[in-house]
């Protein structure tokens, strides 16, 4: 066991040791170690997770006859229920795409999609800042891959030109809203690029955009009117939609390939029907949350200006606002200071972010008030 203890001690010496906190949730507040704090670290972007009215309306429609609390099996065996198909049809209809497929989580989706859709003769070109789940999916794909500089589409174009005719297919992989910097990919440029090269497909993860952007809350692809141009559009229900699970919208052929070849889908017990029913309930109402989206954007613009004034660094265009401090010790100290002031802020350190860019990842939600965010800015 000594080798494992040494690993932990080394993490501690580098200020990279992590632990699971004991938390009590009270709406937009969190209590930790008897300290009640405004939660500045949540992905509950629309503030729906603690909405009692929504929860009550959902439960009332069933009376006491709730959907099952377990699927007990993979969907490909006995674990499929009508509500799964209902949700897939609703998602496909809203996106005006041929098909949609559900997954147990965003990590689950990103882990399994690329290995299912590539061969040893394929190529993956991924943005340098894509999420860890996408990196793990790339590693499992066992095909050639390269990472283009973050949002550098000239670099991506050079890689595409360099590899023309060398591979059976090429996947361009990106997030739309990047989870640590809060900046946004230029999906229009990516669509134009993929159209210039044969057998090239675009895979976009909208985990931090679904619910928050677009007229109907369908993400950056909807905002930019590009839904039909993206081969694989992936999103999660576990953030703005206050539920669990994930989806991909695509054509029917890709859906059938995933059903037949995606190991995390084939070999996992499906989500409980109860949770899928809650997701359906929320997703059905997604267009109704325009006031929440508008309020969130106002809060976000204010906080971005405040942080930029202090750090001179502001990559974000969204409700994810990075307060970049540099070293691990600085990020840990600032997080502790803000928690003492009543704000639940967490340090983000390597390897989650590049070395010397440790930060507080500030994440706003639509149930916060303008006064709360203004008071927080004073503490910065």
Swiss-Prot record:
**Pfam hit, one:** Aminotran_1_2
What PROSITE patterns does the record point to?
Answer: AA_TRANSFER_CLASS_2
- What is the catalytic activity of this protein? 6-carboxyhexanoyl-[ACP] + L-alanine + H(+) = (8S)-8-amino-7-oxononanoate + holo-[ACP] + CO2
Sites bearing N6-(pyridoxal phosphate)lysine, chain numbering? 239
UniProt record, GO biological process: biotin biosynthetic process
List required co-factors.
pyridoxal 5'-phosphate
Question: Where, by residue number, does substrate bind?
Answer: 18, 131, 352
Residues at which pyridoxal 5'-phosphate binds: 106-107, 179, 205-208, 236-239
For molecular function, the Gene Ontology terms on record are: 8-amino-7-oxononanoate synthase activity; pyridoxal phosphate binding
State the EC number(s). 2.3.1.47
Transferase is among the record's keywords: yes
**Keywords assigned by UniProt?**
Biotin biosynthesis, Pyridoxal phosphate, Transferase
- Alphabetized Gene3D superfamilies for the sequence: Aspartate Aminotransferase, domain 1 (3.90.1150.10), Type I PLP-dependent aspartate aminotransferase-like (Major domain) (3.40.640.10)
Superkingdom in the source lineage: Bacteria
Q: In which pathway does it act?
A: Cofactor biosynthesis; biotin biosynthesis
What the entry lists under InterPro entries is as follows: Aminotrans_II_pyridoxalP_BS (IPR001917), Aminotransferase_I/II_large (IPR004839), AON_synthase_class-II (IPR050087), AONS_Archaea/Proteobacteria (IPR004723), PyrdxlP-dep_Trfase (IPR015424), PyrdxlP-dep_Trfase_major (IPR015421), PyrdxlP-dep_Trfase_small (IPR015422)
For this chain, the family text in UniProt reads: Belongs to the class-II pyridoxal-phosphate-dependent aminotransferase family. BioF subfamily.
Indicate the quaternary assembly: Homodimer.
Q: What is this protein's function per UniProt?
A: Catalyzes the decarboxylative condensation of pimeloyl-[acyl-carrier protein] and L-alanine to produce 8-amino-7-oxononanoate (AON), [acyl-carrier protein], and carbon dioxide.
Which PANTHER family is this protein grouped with? 8-AMINO-7-OXONONANOATE SYNTHASE, CLASS II AMINOTRANSFERASE/8-AMINO-7-OXONONANOATE SYNTHASE
Return the protein name.
Answer: Putative 8-amino-7-oxononanoate synthase
Q: Which source organism does the UniProt entry give?
A: Neisseria meningitidis serogroup C / serotype 2a (strain ATCC 700532 / DSM 15464 / FAM18)
Query: Which gene is annotated as encoding this protein in its UniProt record?
Result: bioF
